[in-house]
């Protein structure tokens, strides 16, 4: 069962989308995130605040990646001045893309 982590982050400087995309690429390359996660999305809330949604393959994968994630979060806080405002997480019980695949495989009507 997929596991979802949703967080909000505050930056000292206005968000620079290109810089953040470069940082995300660095995280992917450094920590081999594909081993544990399905998707990570960062989105802008306001000029200084962004949200993140991370979808892990399972709760076990979330816990396996947790130490690496802590290292990158510490770096983000110390070097990029990005601090965690709040976080929520839990198992996903309904995922639209999974339902579409399941219905297609079963030849069920889509409406």
Tell what function each PLM region has.
Residues 77-82:
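Conserved short loop/helix modules at catalytic or binding sites
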Residues 1-50, 57-71, 83-111:
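Short S/T/G/P-rich N-terminal loop/turn motif that feeds into the first structured element of a domain
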């Amino acid at each position: 069962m997929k596991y979802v982590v949703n967080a909000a982050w505050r930056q000292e400087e206005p968000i620079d989308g290109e810089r953040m995309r470069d940082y995300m690429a660095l995280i992917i390359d450094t920590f081999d995130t594909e081993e544990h996660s399905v998707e990570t999305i960062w989105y802008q809330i306001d000029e200084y605040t962004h949200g993140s949604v991370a979808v892990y393959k399972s709760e076990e994968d979330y816990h396996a990646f947790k130490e690496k994630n802590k290292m990158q979060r510490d770096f983000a806080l110390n070097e990029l001045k990005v601090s965690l405002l709040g976080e929520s997480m839990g198992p996903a019980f309904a995922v639209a893309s999974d339902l579409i695949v399941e219905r297609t495989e079963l030849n069920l009507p889509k409406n």
